[in-house]
């Protein structure tokens, strides 16, 4: 059936366009040489000053996307609320290359929330090094 191929479309993709322009949300999209230097083809992030109003929708999108796609998942749930999550999704093929896909979601102190989507040739280790070397 056709909808099986639609799995390629992740629900979190819609969140970036939907919330990217909101007042208390910072959207970052990298392109060009920065992406290349980290072996990424896509990097998108949303940082919510207060993620609470968006939390349920983000959580639903993540649950949907991980269902058929997740190869690896790490989640921290607190009273039914997803506090932090990391997913490595099944590879996707683009222009003859198999690309890794990652979703990272985290609620920090004062309800600040971050949602990141990464696609590229980079390995899980490279991705972790890139994300956490700045901390």
Where are these regions (language model features)?
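Terminal interaction module
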Residues: 12-16, 70, 135
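Bacterial Sec-dependent N-terminal signal peptides
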Residues: 1-12
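Short, low-complexity, Pro/Ser/Thr/Gly-rich segments in the mature regions of secreted, periplasmic
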Residues: 123-135
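Second-shell loop/turn segments in exported
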Residues: 42-50, 116-118
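N-terminal targeting signals for Sec/Tat export/insertion, comprising classic cleavable signal peptides
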Residues: 17-43
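Helix-rich interaction surfaces within compact, conserved domain-sized segments
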Residues: 36-42, 55, 105-106, 114, ...
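Mature extracytoplasmic domains of secretory-pathway proteins
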Residues: 46-94
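A short, solvent-exposed beta-edge/loop patch
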Residues: 88-123
């Amino acid at each position: 059936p056709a909808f099986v191929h639609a799995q390629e479309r992740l629900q979190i993709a819609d969140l970036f366009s939907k919330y990217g322009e909101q007042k208390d949300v910072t959207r970052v999209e990298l392109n060009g040489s920065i992406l290349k230097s980290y072996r990424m083809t896509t990097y998108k992030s949303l940082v919510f000053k207060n993620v609470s109003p968006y939390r349920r929708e983000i959580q639903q999108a993540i649950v949907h996307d991980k269902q058929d796609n997740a190869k690896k998942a790490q989640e921290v749930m607190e009273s039914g609320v997803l506090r932090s999550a990391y997913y490595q999704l099944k590879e996707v093929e683009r222009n003859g290359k198999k690309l890794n896909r990652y979703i990272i979601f985290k609620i920090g102190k004062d309800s600040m929330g971050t949602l990141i989507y990464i696609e590229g040739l980079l390995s899980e280790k490279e991705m972790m090094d890139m994300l956490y070397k700045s901390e």
